[in-house]
Amino acid sequence: MTTISTTESNPTLPSSGGPLLRAEPDRNCQLCPRLAAFREAARAREARWFNSPVPSFGDPNGRVLIIGLAPGLQGANRTGRPFTGDFAGDLLYATLIEFGFAAGTYQARPDDGLTLVDCRISNAVRCVPPQNRPLPAEISNCRPFLSATIETMPRLRSIVTLGRIAHDTTVKALGLRGSAAPFAHGAIHHAGALKLYDSYHCSRYNTNTGVLTPKMFRSVFARVRADLGAQPNAISTRRPGERRDR
């Protein structure tokens, strides 16, 4: 566990009197020409898909923010909701339901009625990148939206970063020194009033190769829940004896 010093008394709060913070890019955002072109090509092929920057999902007044890498081509880029429609969402939402950060049943579609509890999900890069690999410039271009997302969550206490890229850009969004908060699965870093929790990304590749197991993933959210305390409004739909490692 590390404690990160900053030059600001509270890096999570917007400065008073500053410009209006914009947490979501335009539907036709052109900040990254490569991503815009890839998005347009997807629109031409699949006109019924979302094919736009994917907005954050969940409660802006939540205490937990989960940050992924970017929308998957046939996941969030198709459905318009983070981590919805691909394997990563299967593991993430099952885990959130288990620990009371989501309620309902995840059915891999945005109209499944699933709600987040005290929690919000966003991505380091809001547009789908070719081969799931955003370029450094694209990560930098999207960082102001991440910063605004963080700054417009007044009750935020915990940030869970899924993967090294999400971790690194979050550290930069908070204006912190990366060397003071190296990424490692299960690591916890303090940044003022915030705690940053690191996890390997819950991708199919990571789980298939054993880099991340469901048990390892659940352990991160178990710690978040323990640190925050119980959420009385959380509703778990998991039945006794039901497998959790699907």
Where are these regions (language model features)?
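Ala/Thr-enriched low-complexity intrinsically disordered regions
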Residues: T2-T7, T12, A234-T237
